[in-house]
Amino acid sequence: MTTPALAWKLLLLCCLLMPLAARTAPAPRELLDSGHADEALRLLNGASGSRNAESSNYLCRVYYSLQDWDNAIRHCERAVKSEPGNAVYQLWMGRSYGQKASVSNPVWAYALARKTVACFKVAHELDRNYMPAARDLAEYYTTAPAIVGGGNDKALALAAEIAPQHPSDAAWVRAMAAASAGHPEEAEREYAEAIRLDHDSATTYLDLAHYLRGRKSWDRFQQTVERAMQSPRIQPADRYNAAEMLLRTERNLDQAARLLLAYIHSENTGEEAPVFRAHFLLGEVLRKMGDNGQAAAEYRAALALASNYRPATDALRRLGQR
């Protein structure tokens, strides 16, 4: 075979293989959704474009899932500096500031809280139909003190704004405001309205369950979780969230374990419920049930996906294992 002919055959082979490589190479979002934090970091840090806004935002979100707030902030600030008009980037920067504020001393927490609400407001102003930003802003308004920009009046104004296009979300905001103001009957009416408007979705039932948990209304809490899990409009992440609530209340741990296993083995996991953290939560459930051996196996499964996830490392250490 002549050299030119060989060269053409090699070129043709490369052209045929390139689409296959493109299909098999995981994208950052796919790795986030499947909970492969270590692999996502390797991909993003090794990419030639790792300093562009999109990659910086993904790095922020990976570190956020790992509860590494300092690195999350660093990369989110880089993304926002490159593209300040991106609502998604502003939202994730606000979330990172908020989480850092929750573990900071009062002076730093005050400054970070101000940054948090500023980012949420910018994100909402950039895209008023982007409900994750609107909901985070509403939650901030109903939970933060006025000195750092909170206020039920602001939450209710936001609810009125989004109500025409997003009535269920608006009812949820009104429920949060009523709960914050100490009006439990009104809060429950609005939670019920959110459930009705969202056609009995599991997510809205879990919003009500979260409220009932805070009021220590345990029987109704358990009933509401059950209704959420029986909803025809249930998403895989709803099972994760229900299991976490059951774990935190130390109620019905058998069900919590089943829900986490169902989520881990589903084909539709997501960034909002990291798979490595589902393994960690399952380990916590099993430990509380007295099965330290299986708990350790779940902690290790979490670390296999996210080797820097400190809660799993600490949990193994408490069990006297590595």
Language model segments and positions:
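Alpha-helical adaptor scaffolds
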Residues: 29, 139, 143, 210-214, ...
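Residue-level recognition of tetratricopeptide repeat
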Residues: 29, 52-54, 61, 86, 95, 102, 130, 167-169, ...
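Short coil/linker segments at helix-helix boundaries
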Residues: 31, 67-81, 85, 89-129, ...
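Structural marker of alpha-solenoid helical repeat scaffolds
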Residues: 49-50, 82, 126, 162-165, ...
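Canonical tetratricopeptide repeat
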Residues: 58-61, 92, 136, 173, ...
